């Protein structure tokens, strides 16, 4: 009897260790809230200045002309690098960042467009918000404590775009 209880205790302890280890690599374990540093694309975060973006990537391939936004009460323009990495500035700070092709631009956890959709849940855990459209497109949205959003779009089992929204 005593030996059976000891064996049961060892088994329970081992099972606890295995379940804890399974969650170690998962970023989003606490109420669907990421750390601010987890929300970046290619080293660019919401709030990164225009000068910092240019320091990392140089001059953009294309740039839209700044336009006034009544909703934001500031000027808005977009830098595009290549054809698939977009950084939208409100004033002098990056507010929306998006990549929509397999171009090597990654999150700090190494997730890129073209990766299997399963990588999203494996690394980030349960999303703050999830939706699936009739066409099969799935959207996984995560956020930090400041409501900065990190969104993944997937279709047919693969990530098709990754975006950051400065205020979700």
Role assignments for model-derived ranges:
Residues 1-4:
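Positively charged n-region of N-terminal signal peptides that target proteins for export
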Residues 6, 103-105, 147:
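Short Gly/Pro-enriched loop/turn and capping motifs at secondary-structure junctions
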Residues 8-16:
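Bacterial N-terminal signal peptides
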Residues 17-136, 155-168:
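Short helix/turn-capping signatures at newly exposed starts of structured segments
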Residues 141-157:
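Short, exposed beta-strand-loop hairpins at the edges of beta-sheets
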